Amino acid sequence: MSIPNSFIIVGSGVFGLSLAYALSLDDRFADKKIILVDRWNFEPPNATGSVHNPAAANADTSRVIRRDYPHGPYASLALEAMKHWRGKFGENNRYVNQRLLFSGEGSSLTTPPKALETVNYIKKAYAISCELTPGGRDAVQVLDSLDEVRAFLGNTPSHPPHLPVNKDPAARDLRGYVSNDCGWADAGASIEWLRQEVLRLGRVECVVGEVESLVYSDDQRAVKGVKLVDGKVLTAELTVIAAGARSSHILGIPKLCDVYSEFVAYIQLTKEEADELRRRQWPILVNCHRGVFAVGPDHDNCLKFGHFSYSGIVDVLREASIQVPTRPDGWEAQQKYWSDPRFAFGGEVKVSALGDVDDYENPAAQRALADYRLFLLELLGPTGLQGVDTLGLDQSDNLLNNIANRPFTRVRKCWYNDTPALDFVVDYHPSYGKTLFVATGGCDHAFKFLPIIGEKTLALILRNRGDSAVSLPAGVEPSLEELSELWRFPVELLQDN
């Protein structure tokens, strides 16, 4: 089967924009029609460049870029993407190197995994990290207790210094390791830059419009394009649905992705405080036991706190041999959002001057802020029993203690788009020949692969059309065959539809 003569890509996010970029760089598509559709106007009048949607998921100020995964294929992809983040994609401070402190709770990292321990997720990631890191295990620093973690951060032990320390490797404790091969990216700036690159290459027609429905052939066996809400019809040989949280709705497959929101909070630092943390080579903090992470200081001198997505929590608990059911308020509940024009575009949440959520009828927000506060106090808070009796051994770090108790200055919602298998869906829809391709289900981590996900998607588009000549460069892992299986379309969902 020949390569498509025309494309419609629905969605100018991670999957869609990166695919448009890959097509623009490939001479085989120099004379092909490529249309990129998004309901957000990235190039409004009088703008000097592209402007990202400030409430979209990809508007994040500091998205974690890590290669530390407990799953080999994603670890390999992240390692490949990291090279690009440290090159062209990360120029002009779009990417910032920051080491990662990756932790969980349970027995020592030097012992085998045990059931019901979240540190299993860390142990698996640690083993892969040792394989990928030059120098192996000797080059990866292990922090095998909460006290070691706090000491690494420059804080005092979590217990009064005159009490004995439990060194039992089987005891439950916070344990982790430090990876130097990580950082964060200004996601909004990255999307704006990539959009400008696509426009500069001049091969893609960008259309502002919201897709109302797919357009089918008379016999319903092929997709001919899309119809916009204003009635305009766009046609192409291949339609690619990469619409993020709206993909399930456009495709009419509610259970393809679970769409929901979580809360992100920020603490403002002074310039002096932020500079001091940078001087200390402050790490990204990830505690998979609490399901909480902290990134920064960012370019605005803020620390950002977020929750793992539900899929991320499920992934951690699976490694602990704990089975978790589908979210009880999952797929069906999302339907009420489809008519809301703000759907999947996040949104600000009002907070008081003291950092409390103004909407006191929002228990989810209150729980999120409580989780972040506990996370902070555990790592950065003052030593227990300080102020009672520390036998004159008080060595508390006022900077860290102050941050641990500081009000949150900003809270926002961000949307997640999880697949049941917790893997992306990058494959042809099986019901329409080779006329409808799906690229969605970012599961809270697709942005890490922004520099390479487009070329992988294009390779799968061509390979699955029967082009046996399509391959990745020698030595690149995972192979196209592995990706094709990992990101296959879940045909079983069509039986329930």
Swiss-Prot record:
Deletion consequences: Leads to complete abolishment of isoquinoline alkaloid production and accumulation of a series of benzyl pyrroles, including fumipyrrole.
Superkingdom of origin: Eukaryota
S-8alpha-FAD cysteine, modified sites: 414
pH dependence: Optimum pH is 7.6.
SUPFAM superfamilies: FAD/NAD(P)-binding domain (SSF51905)
Cofactor(s) demanded: FAD
Protein name: Amino acid oxidase fsqB
Subunit architecture: Dimer.
Consequence the record notes for mutating residue 63 to M: Severely compromises enzymatic activity
Keywords: FAD, Flavoprotein, Oxidoreductase
Species the sequence originates in: Aspergillus fumigatus (strain ATCC MYA-4609 / CBS 101355 / FGSC A1100 / Af293) (Neosartorya fumigata)
Positions contributing to FAD binding: 14-15, 38, 53, 57-58, 63-64, 211, 447-448
UniProt enzyme class: oxidoreductase
